[in-house]
Design a protein with these regions (language model features):
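Hydrophobic positions on the alpha1 helix immediately C-terminal to the Walker A/P-loop
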Residues: 45-49
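Charged, amphipathic alpha-helical linker segments immediately N-terminal to NTP-binding catalytic cores
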Residues: 1-9
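ATP-dependent carboxylate-amine ligase catalytic core
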Residues: 15, 19-30, 56-144, 160-162, ...
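ATP-dependent carboxylate-amine ligase
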Residues: 3, 144-145, 167, 264, ...
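Hydrophobic anchor at the beta1->P-loop junction of P-loop NTPases
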Residues: 35-37
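Nucleotide phosphate-binding/pyrophosphate-handling subdomain across enzymes
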Residues: 127-130, 139-150, 155-158, 168, ...
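Acidic, Mg2+-coordinating active-site environments of NTP-dependent enzymes
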Residues: 104, 124-131, 146-239, 252-269
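Beta-strand->loop->alpha-helix junctions that form or flank phosphate-binding loops
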Residues: 64, 184-187, 198-222, 241-246, ...
Length: 434
């Protein structure tokens, strides 16, 4: 398959190559309205929420998101369904031909972005929800012209590309804003002055959490549901949702603000019927047959949010265990150092087929932690041991975290599925880490 032959080009500091390939198809990215969602954390969940709400309202909806957990086609969905294999391969071959004719070499992410745009145009979608892969300014999805932009959070991640300070990271992410278009944004208060400078320069219309919209949880979780309050321009509104983790509140509020301040109107009753059925795999996802939660937190801020959620839902750390593994280049020491606040038992491993941190390094780090027990080993053995531990005593809970690639591997292992990708394809995919 062509994707397996892509080399590790990394990030192109510009949009010229993908722009030329898209021009070869008469710019399919301009054929549909779009919402573009950026953010250090929460952008994927917000994109999933928006896609579900538009779909429930009768819009033919495209969703472009990343990374995938099991099947690469998870990244390109139409009306909640993975792009069918025939359409995927057709779009991929077409993109490959144009790329080769132009003598260009797209990255893995750029190629899939072209495939997504072609698929959405050919399916005549009414709207596309586009999750930014990395940053914003030079992200392949920024070749589109979104009607609404969203920024879900700003924290330190990918600093070697985006910059070492929050101000630099904000500038990269806020570059997705469009002149005269709403920009729904959440970021730390101390960045307000920097944001104002960017707003004046780029000319977008700011819709800020804490100013134009806000909200709060209205109830604790009960039977897998939780209520939240949304406050926009009008009266407060209360909705129930199946996304119950405390850190998911901002994602829900951001999606609600898109519907209020964007050009589309979806009735409250449609929203109220859709939110209780929402699911977002790999983010506070409970397995149905095991006391196991999957959460792909993969940077210090998202890990702190996960720990707060665990402590709220499962306050006894002696009953909480972790199956954890991390990708090189991430601040794994800070992440692993946070976890003992919520649990005491650790199964340390490496996400398979990735450039992972050696589990022995994790063990060495954990060795100085008092009050914690840990074991270390290959993925299969640690998964078996961790799942067995979770079922030995009633009330125990196992949390799988550290990388979305680890979460995806557990989903395949737990369901008995083998990867639908060849070893070569997995190696290519592993160079683009969540």
């Amino acid at each position: 398959m062509f994707l397996a032959r892509l080399t590790r080009h990394g990030i192109h500091p510009g949009l010229d190559s993908i722009g030329r390939v898209l021009s070869g198809f008469n710019n399919p990215q301009f054929s549909f309205p779009a919402v573009q969602v950026a953010g250090t954390n929460g952008k994927g969940t917000t994109a999933v929420i928006l896609a579900a709400l538009f779909r429930s309202a009768g819009f033919r909806t495209g969703l472009f998101t990343s990374p995938h957990l099991v099947d690469v086609r998870e990244r390109i969905q139409i009306d909640g369904q993975l792009l069918d294999p025939t359409s995927f391969l057709t779009c991929l071959r077409d993109a490959c031909r144009v790329q080769e004719r132009l003598g260009l070499s797209l990255t893995f992410f750029e190629m899939l972005t072209v495939v997504g745009f072609l698929a959405f145009e050919r399916a005549s979608v009414d709207i596309a929800i586009l999750e930014v892969g990395l940053g914003g300014r030079w992200d392949a999805t920024s070749t589109a012209r979104p009607d609404v932009s969203v920024l879900t959070s700003v924290a330190k991640d990918h600093t070697e590309i985006l910059g070492e300070t929050l101000e630099k990271i904000l500038r990269e992410k806020a570059a997705i804003g469009r002149v005269g278009k709403p920009f729904i944004a959440t970021f730390p208060d101390h960045l307000r002055d920097e944001w104002s400078l960017i707003e004046k320069k780029r000319g977008f219309l700011s819709v800020l959490r804490g100013r134009e919209f806000d909200g709060a949880w209205a109830s604790p979780e009960l039977l897998g549901k939780r209520s939240f309050i949304y406050q926009g321009r009008a009266e407060k509104k209360v909705f129930q949702t199946a996304l119950v983790a405390r850190y998911q509140l901002n994602n829900l509020l951001s999606a609600m603000a898109v519907l209020e301040y964007g050009p589309w109107k979806i009735p409250d009753e449609v929203i109220a019927s859709a939110l209780p059925t929402l699911r977002n795999p790999g983010r506070w996802e409970r397995l149905p047959s095991f006391p196991v939660i999957l959460d792909g937190a993969h940077n210090p801020e998202s890990m702190r949010e996960l720990v707060e959620q665990i402590r709220e839902a499962f306050p006894d750390p002696e009953r909480v265990g972790f199956l954890a593994g991390f990708i090189k280049g991430k601040d794994w020491e800070e992440m692993l150092g946070i976890l003992p606040e919520a649990g005491r038992t650790f199964f340390l491993t490496a996400p398979p087929d990735t450039d992972a941190v050696d589990p022995l390094q994790l063990a060495s780090f954990m060795g100085v932690r008092k009050g914690c027990s840990f074991s270390v080993g290959q993925f299969d053995s640690m998964s078996v041991n961790a799942f067995e531990w979770s079922g030995q005593v009633p009330g125990r809970i196992l949390v799988v975290t550290g990388s979305l690639y680890l979460v995806g591997a557990v989903k395949r292992w737990q369901s008995g599925e083998t990867s639908p990708l060849s070893a070569g394809e997995r190696n290519v995919f592993s160079s683009f880490h969540p």
